[in-house]
Amino acid sequence: TTAEHLLLAAQTCRQARIERLKLYLMVGLPGETTRDMEECAALVRELSRLLPISLGISTFCAKVGTPLQTAPFAGIDVAQRHIKTLRRALAGKAEVRATSIRWAWVEHVLAGGSASEGLAVFEAERRGGTFSDYRKAFEKLGHTPFSAHPGDD
């Protein structure tokens, strides 16, 4: 299994005197649940018994030309909840760093956008270029950074 491969890789790294294992994880994938985050955390805790772990977390952003190009954005609220689950479960076991969920939403809107979103970028930048400026400009086009059903998991 993948977990067995990761454990073997960590053992090999330890034998080679590599000091730290860096892992990358994406949250917000279609169908992802809190249970999935708990399982990921359990695996990272197991790996941390072999080596110190640095865990980088990014939020899924669908891209044109990929199999998941039409997948919706999970929602800032859902991604935050999943990252919080990981941070809590890995406290003292792994160094956890997450990229900005808010800017991942902006990236998501732009990745699937059209000329209208391009004009919204112009408007947001003219107003200052903060996340709030982007959110307001994109919300005028019907984009929302939060999930339709934040409790669904």
State the predicted function of each range:
Residues 1-49, 65-81:
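Conserved non-cysteine loop/helix-boundary elements of the Radical SAM core domain that shape
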Residues 47-51, 84-95:
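Structural alpha-beta junctions
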Residues 91-153:
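Radical SAM enzyme core and accessory elements
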Residues 19-25, 53-58, 96-98:
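Hydrophobic faces of well-ordered beta-strands that scaffold small-molecule active sites
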Residues 25-31, 59-63, 100-104:
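Active-site-proximal loop/turn and secondary-structure-junction residues that shape catalytic pockets
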Residues 73-87, 117-126:
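Acidic, Ser/Thr-rich peripheral helices and adjacent loops at domain boundaries
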Residues 12-16, 54-59, 148-151:
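Short, compositionally biased low-complexity segments
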